[in-house]
Amino acid sequence: MDIRILKPSDLPLIQHANLENLPENYFLKYYLYHALSWPQLSFVAVDVARPKKTPYDYPKIVGYVLAKMEEEPTDGVQHGHITSLSVMRTHRRLGIAEKLMRQSQLAMVESFGAHYVSLHVRVSNGAAIHLYKDTLGFQNEKTEKAYYADGEDAYSMRLDLSSIREQIQDEADSEGVDEGEAVGDVGSDPAKKKTKKKAAGNGEKDKRKVKVGRGLGVGELVEKNEAKQP
């Protein structure tokens, strides 16, 4: 199974997956709007185990997450929103939905600095509620009456993304740490450098212990005189 960014060529396939699995359906241009406006945030799950019969075969998309950033958040806080999540019935209980969600959440923080992500779910959709609440850690903020076209209520849920923000910051900090040692005079202490030159000017020997390779048949430390004799 391969999780990758949604491409415009995938749109008819994710629309098919949506029609197969969800009662909330959208026009193709709505998917295109997401793909063009926030290309970093939507992902598809591709069944790579299915061999292609020809080079022109479409990939077998078995799941997708359609996401966006709220353009004018009412609370003034930059955050993302999950518009739609779907996995084909033949590929459920494999952790695909969780992977799609986590990938989208990470992209929201990396690309847009999102502070949290929101979504709506039918109050009768127990499997989805379990995924969002128990697996991913979403919190139920409120119930919106008659949110869906058929009159069913929806839970408005939200997940704080501060842990992802901290993880990204920690990784950035660790990449910036130089654990190596100075080579030659680069990065050396100027005071020690002057002392070394002064000792050489007074005719003192500058000795250093070096390890000689085993290939030469010597396994001890020897002293090497590096001072130039006049």
Task: Locate the predicted segments by residue.
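Conserved hydrophobic beta-strand within the GNAT/NAT acetyltransferase core sheet
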Residues: 82, 117-121
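Short, charged, solvent-exposed linker or helix-capping segments at domain edges/interfaces
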Residues: 166-176
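Intrinsically disordered, low-complexity serine/threonine-rich segments
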Residues: 174-177, 181-184, 188
